[in-house]
């Protein structure tokens, strides 16, 4: 958050560190009393007569339904279905005698010590799982249909930490924050302006970590240009270290079917495993999966025009956070929060009950 400095020396934080930061922020601002836990909004109906949202809320502890109202509906749940991850329809999954796990349903008591593990996928989830499991497993294989771009760098910002030591807490945080924002913009502009050179640089970067003998052309040369899809960050090069140690391997092939012992590939090779992890992504779910109606008419979001990536045409008093996709998500979310506060304060100042974006005659659908 812009108002609360991140004091950890690590710029790439793990889940416990982020949770600790959030709890600290909540406690410092006495926000816990304003948060209702284990509650899920399942339906929201806007009443133009009352200028209110009527909500149906499910209590997750006993599945009871409560009804309440609000002036403004601010959706901050992202655009994924966190209840269930995406898993392709693999042939003969039921034949596999081991465990098949999607990271979204990760069992806390999973014992993978000295086990053969296959991770299907090559995105951010797979890149996180492979090095974190490599130390304990017998062997772990990252099975990918096609390669992804990777960039390894330290998880600590030495320049940023040096700046913080020379300045006050808030000034240092402000300067480092802007340094990182500008560096991200410069990097993105370079990627887009010189895609071929950037592609060569990223592939050579992988070669430096894995050595000339590694088949980088097959396993680490994507079919697309950098930033057509997002790059994967490899903190401290941990995934490459796991591969160099021999505990982790990349296989580039397509899946024919599951077998009792593992996975048979279209090449004819069979990979054996005790555990198969399907790091194959998440399902999209817009507007938090809430059944939204405007004066009892169901909202069809596909027919609406988005305004400033946060509001929708002809939908009153609703804001949905959508952060950046080419920079830190939270930077975009923070700007939307600021705009929302200014907008609500403006309504109070003008003694208005609602706001509602409208499309003009000059708007062209794309």
Regions from the PLM with identified roles:
Residues 200, 204, 209-272:
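Alpha/beta-hydrolase fold catalytic core
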Residues 41, 67-81, 116-120, 140, ...:
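Short hydrophobic core segments
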Residues 73-215, 248, 271, 322-366:
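Rossmann-like dinucleotide-binding core of oxidoreductases
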Residues 1-10, 16-19, 160-175:
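N-terminal glycine-rich dinucleotide-binding loop that anchors FAD/FMN and/or NAD(P) in oxidoreductases
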Residues 279-348:
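Glycine/threonine-rich phosphate-binding loop and adjacent beta-strand/alpha-helix elements that clamp
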Residues 97-100, 256, 261-303:
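Extended hydrophobic/aromatic segments used for targeting, binding, or gating
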Residues 5-24, 36, 120, 190-200, ...:
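Short beta-strand to alpha-helix junction loop
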Residues 10-81, 202, 209, 247, ...:
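Feature captures the FAD/FMN-dependent oxidoreductase FAD-binding
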């Amino acid at each position: 958050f812009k108002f609360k400095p991140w004091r950890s020396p690590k710029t790439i934080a793990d889940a416990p560190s982020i949770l600790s930061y959030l709890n600290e922020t909540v406690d410092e601002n006495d926000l816990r009393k304003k948060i209702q836990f284990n509650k899920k909004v399942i339906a929201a109906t806007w009443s133009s007569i009352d200028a209110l949202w009527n909500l149906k809320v499910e209590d997750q502890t006993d599945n009871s339904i409560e009804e309440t109202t609000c002036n403004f509906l601010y959706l901050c749940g992202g655009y994924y279905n966190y209840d269930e991850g995406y898993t392709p329809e693999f042939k003969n999954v039921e034949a596999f005698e081991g465990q098949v796990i999607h990271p979204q349903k990760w069992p806390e008591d999973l014992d993978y010590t000295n086990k053969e593990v296959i991770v299907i996928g090559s995105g951010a989830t797979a890149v996180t799982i492979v090095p974190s499991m490599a130390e304990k497993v017998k062997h772990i294989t990252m099975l990918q249909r096609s390669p992804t771009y990777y960039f390894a760098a330290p998880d600590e910002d030495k320049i940023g930490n040096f700046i913080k030591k020379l300045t006050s807490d808030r000034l240092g945080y402000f300067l480092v924050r802007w340094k990182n924002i500008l560096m991200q913009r410069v990097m993105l502009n370079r990627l887009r302006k010189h895609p071929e050179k950037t592609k060569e640089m990223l592939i050579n970067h992988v070669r430096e970590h894995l050595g000339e003998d590694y088949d980088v052309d097959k396993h680490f040369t994507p079919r697309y240009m950098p930033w057509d899809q997002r790059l994967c960050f490899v903190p401290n090069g941990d995934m490459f270290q796991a591969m160099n140690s021999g505990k982790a391997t990349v296989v580039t092939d397509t899946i024919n079917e599951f077998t009792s012992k593992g996975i048979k590939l279209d090449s004819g090779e069979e990979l054996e495993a005790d555990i198969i992890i399907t790091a194959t992504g998440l399902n999209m779910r817009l507007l938090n999966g809430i059944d939204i109606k405007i004066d009892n008419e169901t909202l069809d979001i596909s027919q609406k025009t988005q305004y400033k990536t946060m509001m929708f045409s002809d939908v009153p008093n609703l804001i949905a956070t959508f952060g950046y996709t080419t920079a830190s998500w939270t930077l975009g979310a923070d700007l939307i929060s600021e705009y929302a506060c200014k907008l609500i304060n403006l309504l109070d100042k003008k003694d208005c009950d609602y706001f509602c974006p409208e499309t003009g005659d000059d708007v062209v659908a794309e």
